[in-house]
Regions:
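Conserved glycine-rich cofactor-binding loop
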Residues: 14-15
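Substrate-binding pocket helix/loop in short-chain dehydrogenase/reductase
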Residues: 86-87, 94-99, 193
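Active-site helix of classical SDR
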Residues: 110, 146
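Alpha-helical segment proximal to the catalytic Tyr-Lys
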Residues: 115, 159-160, 221
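C-terminal substrate-recognition "lid" of short-chain dehydrogenase/reductases
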Residues: 122, 202-230, 235
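Residue(s) in the substrate-gating loop at a strand-loop-helix junction
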Residues: 130
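Short, small/polar-rich loop/turn modules that mediate ligand/substrate recognition or access, typified
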Residues: 162, 167, 223-225
Length: 237
């Protein structure tokens, strides 16, 4: 009997890094379930799309139940939201929304897929954090809280699961050249950021996808519990 293909879930996959990750895993021969908030997205054959808003508790609950039936081998928690604000002005509802999408949802999805990974003695979990989950700066309290927390969860998962053949890692992108980054930074901001990056350019979504592709592959047999920065040297040089 031919071995079935690995099956992956990639959240936040309608554009940018998430789309690039879904596309790359498909090229690697992996069946992909992609999520997003759009009702319809054009994907290549081999990608199934599940629309879900992670701020909607009932939709999240339905998606969790769906995943429990899908025999998921690979989970990439990429979906995230952000709001930049001075600490004293942060609205608690905004804070709760950011933690719900960036931390609570990955927690629930991990709980949904890990039982199958344990049964199969194989699994790969990649949580997309951020440079702001490794360092931080002013006006990032909500986002950094969620991303530092997500990395903490990754380390806890690795300590608990790595001996079962389940490897869990975080990937922390820096400034990536996406439509969202361009809209937030503007032309002036883009130029300023590029000057601060040792490589002198923004990263590309396909570079994030390439790293994730390797981390979830059978070539990765010994990396677990790490928060790997992919930022052109921004946080270290």
């Amino acid at each position: 009997m031919a071995k079935r293909k690995y099956r992956a879930v990639v959240t936040g996959a309608t554009r940018g890094m998430g789309y690039a990750i879904a596309e790359r895993l498909l090229k690697d021969g992996i069946e992909v379930i992609a999520t997003g908030t759009s009702e319809d997205v054009d994907y290549p054959n081999g990608v199934s799309y599940y629309p879900v808003d992670f701020l909607d508790d009932s939709r999240v609950e339905a998606f969790v139940e769906y995943l429990k039936q899908q025999k998921i081998d690979i989970l990439v928690n990429n979906a995230g939201i952000n709001k930049i604000d001075e600490f004293a002005n942060i609205d608690i509802d905004d804070f709760d929304r950011i933690l719900k999408v960036n931390l609570r949802t990955p927690f629930l999805l991990c709980q949904a897929v890990i039982p199958h990974m344990k049964e199969n003695s194989w699994g790969r979990i990649v949580n997309i954090t951020s440079i702001w989950g490794n360092i931080t700066k002013e006006y990032r309290a909500s986002y950094s809280s969620s991303k530092f927390g997500l990395d903490g969860m990754t380390v806890a998962l690795a300590s608990e699961l790595s001996g079962m053949g389940i490897l869990a890692n975080s990937v922390g992108p820096g400034f990536i050249d996406t439509d969202l980054t361009r809209s937030v930074l503007g032309e002036k901001g883009m130029a300023e950021v590029q000057r601060q990056i040792p490589i002198k350019r923004l990263g590309q979504a396909n570079e994030i996808a390439a790293l994730v592709s390797w981390l979830v592959s059978n070539e990765n047999t010994y990396i677990s519990g790490q928060n790997i920065m992919i930022d052109g040297g921004f946080t270290r040089v």
